[in-house]
Amino acid sequence: MEEPTPEPVYVDVDKGLTLACFVFLCLFLVVMIIRCAKVIMDPYSAIPTSTWEEQHLDD
């Protein structure tokens, strides 16, 4: 008797696309959490010093 030939493995495109989008969203979430944590720890480092305006107080 001949051995049955193995069936070709079909890639489910929908499942692959869903998994890729899920991984991308997880990476995006991790990056955003890290950025937000950095801003919370040191909020003034995120502001460029060129936008700071000196206040002139008139006496």
From Swiss-Prot:
The keyword rRNA processing does not apply. It comes from the Eukaryota. The keyword Membrane applies. Keywords: Membrane, Transmembrane, Transmembrane helix. Coiled coil: none annotated. InterPro entries: Cortexin. GO terms for cellular component: membrane. The chain crosses the membrane at residues 17-37. It is a single-pass membrane protein. It is found in: Membrane. Pfam families: Cortexin. This is Cortexin domain-containing 1 protein. It comes from Mus musculus (Mouse). The lineage of its organism: Eukaryota, Metazoa, Chordata, Craniata, Vertebrata.
